[in-house]
């Protein structure tokens, strides 16, 4: 198998209504063991490509075929699991062959005691079973399951799938898929619903994975550290590049340096981020160059043809005074679990606080308390007199699938009043990369990334001076992520951002709020990498390993 391609596509095309070629004439061959990052704007056909490779979407032009006999594993954005199974039952489906081999091996050993047994036949079967077990490290199976469950912070083994959140189900599906160890992994946004430490673990796992990995992801550190190839989908074409994210952008810089069409807004965007790039430690020089190259791309005339605007607009709220948010001795529990235990911190003016920690640790609960939707068990939250919160409701879930994008944001109004500003509603919606006919798309037809942008457009209408953003980076393409970073940095107010995107947190965060075990929350001045370095020095490398969260129990 090492000398052959594991998967081949020949002149593959895909037409979607109304007669739009989302993919056209793609011919690619995939090497065994290759790690491929798939990039492209939202709606470019990335998920469609993976569905074709997984054999789910067969209505295509051309030919797509895996090498005979290889095992392909696919993680869709919304995986299907048996709702009646427990977490352990769902995970053990991945290792069913090994479990059956272990059970049968015990039976074979017992059969050797029978004097009439066919010992040659038993020995042959024993050899086959031991080969299966050895190939999957089967004698260490329980440890494997526990390590994977800890790394991806799975819910309790006995929890029923039907009671899990969408994010928890997705983590269970990812864990099951990784334990199956297929020859080829097809991963659609695998880092969504993972916290930053679990993303770092997944990055290391896939870096060392022996099989082929094809991953759609917006995680730029992941693309830099794991990908050996970048496959860019641009207006239907698949353009492969051998190298990681940084080298891909370097080669684009050489071509795009000759482009003349540059727009002042994009030039300003480059300058803003280059200020950060130049302040980076020497160890990040390659990434710094990569960022420069990406912004050169955004300025090219070619780019403007495919994406008319690449700015996000955060309307300035009222002027923010010196006192922003002060939290003193905050405690909050649910049932017998303490989520937050004696938390105190003060947010200075212009701060951008990145909030990290395991799912279910209480990050969103803090937002609900800050906005007054829930009360703490004890302690105080004091907002400055000038503070106006733009708080996160679940707009992604609450949006009306039958409305158009423009209607969902504008409610039919031609002019929107946001804080002290008035802006034409179509121009405002256009600031979120919904152009022309895209504003007439039904909400129910949007991709995950498009829903994310629409969610931002609705949230930012609030016009506050302290933004509370709950996982705003989910499903966004890297271009929109860059625009969001710049918009937050240029906003004159404060922001608190729950995120697992390490590059995003490095770029924007002035402080980190980290949810640990037993309700302990750490407030640190610095960005994500600064915090990780401090944590490693203070508590040792083991402190950076993800594990199932431990809750402090309330004594009855």
Question: Can you annotate each of these PLM segments?
Answer:
Residues 251-284, 288-294, 298-305:
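Intracellular alpha-helical coupling/juxtamembrane segments of multi-pass membrane proteins
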